[in-house]
């Protein structure tokens, strides 16, 4: 696994990681209506572009797949941290947090 900075072409994979993480990893703790509100299936790419624009975003990749991503502001405060469920509990979030801390 490797970390790198987000590029605009990564947006579809980042959106998919977010959606899948919310609907899989958070599913035991929230009602479906809450999950759909938090991560709607018809999320708009333009809204995501606006959301990420003021932030620094990094990715962890594994064999060309986005395993997770983190977005943080200029003060280093995390705003978003999500891991693809296929890579859960494999140290992805730890790697991303270490990048942000350094």
PLM features: residue spans?
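Glycine-rich phosphate-binding loop
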Residues: 91
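Conserved GNAT acetyl-CoA-binding A-motif
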Residues: 102
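Acetyl-CoA-dependent GNAT
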Residues: 5-9, 16-86, 94-99
